[in-house]
Structures are given as structure tokens and as C-alpha cells.
């Protein structure tokens, strides 16, 4: 789940209160 506010599309929580880009996003 997601804990707290979700990150932008294509990003996910880095577990330290920030967001990091989702490496798998848009890779088709």
C-alpha cells in the first residue's frame, strides 16, 4: 500500500518520505 499521499504517476515512495521514479513505468 500506499502509506500517506501517493506519489505522482510513474513514481513510488522511497520509504524515507520522498518519491523516486518507477523504473518499470512506461517500459513496454
Swiss-Prot record:
Q: Does the keyword Secreted apply?
A: yes
Q: Which UniProt keywords apply?
A: Disulfide bond, Hydroxylation, Ion channel impairing toxin, Nematocyst, Potassium channel impairing toxin, Secreted, Toxin, Voltage-gated potassium channel impairing toxin
Q: Which cysteines are joined by disulfide bonds?
A: 7-19, 10-25
| PTM annotation | Occurs in 2 forms which differ in the post-translational modification of Pro-6. In form SHTX-1 (Shd1a) Pro-6 is a hydroxyproline while in form SHTX-2 (Shd1b) Pro-6 is unmodified.
Question: Could you confirm whether the keyword Disulfide bond appears in this record?
Answer: yes
Just give the chief location class: secreted
Q: Where in the cell is it found?
A: Secreted; Nematocyst
GO CC terms in record: extracellular region; nematocyst
What GO molecular function annotation could you give as one example from this UniProt entry?
A: potassium channel regulator activity
Q: Which of the residues bear the PTM 4-hydroxyproline? A: 6
Q: Which family is this protein grouped under?
A: Belongs to the sea anemone BBH family.
> So what does this one do?
Kappa-stichotoxin-Shd1a: inhibits voltage-gated potassium channels (Kv).
Q: What is this protein called?
A: Kappa-stichotoxin-Shd1a/kappa-stichotoxin-Shd1b
Q: Tell me which species this is from.
A: Stichodactyla haddoni (Saddle carpet anemone)
